[in-house]
Amino acid sequence: QDTNNLQSRILQLLRKDCTNIAVVGDDAQSIYKFRGANVQNIINFPDLFDDCKEVELVENYRSSKEILALANLSYENFATEGFSKTMNGQFSTGYKPVLMRPDTDEAANIEVANGILDLISIGVPADKICVIARKSRDLFGVEHLLNQHQVAYEKRGGQKFLELRGILDMIAYFRFASNPMDEISLFRLLRLHHGIGDTYASNICELLGIVDNPIINNKYTGFKFAEELRRLHQVFETAKTIPNEDVETKFALFEAFYSDTCARAIKLMKTDEATRTEKYEELESERANIQQLFLIAQQYHSITEFLDALILEQARVEDDKDVKKVVLTTIHSAKGLEFDTVFVLGCVDGLFPQIPIWEMGEVDDSDEEIQEELRCFYVAITRAEKRLYLVCPRTAVFYTGVFKTRITRFLDGCRNTYQESDSYIRLE
């Protein structure tokens, strides 16, 4: 089910003078369209090869009957093509999957983290607990809380939160604002500006403690990038006027300056337009990551408290290979895996399936992108063996503000297959 058109054509040519061929696949788990995979290769297989014999493998030895009841019904309700089949579970747990509906994204992350702590306390091995999200950045909130609780985890399908470039850049602003002698942070920030390379940045950093305000009091006042240095100096002067407790305002100041600085650097860089466009797209992705950092920062009473928490997190990043770890993963990296307990984040219509706000209500469920999202949903929920938690906060932060959410459409018509709760509930 994950083959592309070229691979399908090669298969047809190899089979040209031979009738012996067998393939195994599941059209419901074809989720690599973005890599060129074409689900039609398996759907149309009986038409492409004469005298094709179909054998249905419908016995599922992984998930409970309760989890499969939800998976089967959801897929049956929304799939507009493919093979019709019902997966049969081999055991029952006696409890249905849980739809968790906390008030906010932050509350949802807290409930998931508390759930993980509870599961570990009752004997569920950490490496048999998995948190799945559509995108890697959607895992940042849970990742932050696990760090706080000193719960070991491994990240699949993306870098760890505190390893991301944009996150490290933003932290550097806060660190230098709190400690103007922080040479490492200043060097990082100087390198963001167009025209300032390693040598210039190092020379300026060497002036720390020797002259006042080395960002503007240096030998480069006549250079082309002098205006960039003046801007950097000014943003820190402005930051001094903002109380340490006003986390939101200070964060907004640095985020706006960072975005503008990076955009200016991209605009002025000598490159072709295709590369420039790619750089702008990378910046937008970094800004989305920074939005997640902002949601975390809002939970603290001051910048100092926020930085102290981040320092502790970074100290815990070192991996202990002998410790069992909770798995945080994207859907695409979870395929083929199985876990005792699975939390699926972001079960919000518009996020899962991914539909831009301005297109809500205009996209037909038969659209191939929606069908791909349905298959992603199916893969996510069928990673669970015994316990499945679907997380849909009642409000969520989108680009233009905070909105009331709608439960993912993939649960429409499935109400009898799950139970609903405002918070985590223990299933045993």
Residue ranges and their predicted role:
Residues 2, 24, 135, 192, ...:
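Conserved helicase core region in the C-terminal RecA-like lobe
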Residues 48-49, 91-96, 124-247:
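ATPase/helicase motor core of nucleic-acid motors
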Residues 395-428:
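Helicase C-terminal subdomain and adjacent C-terminal extension
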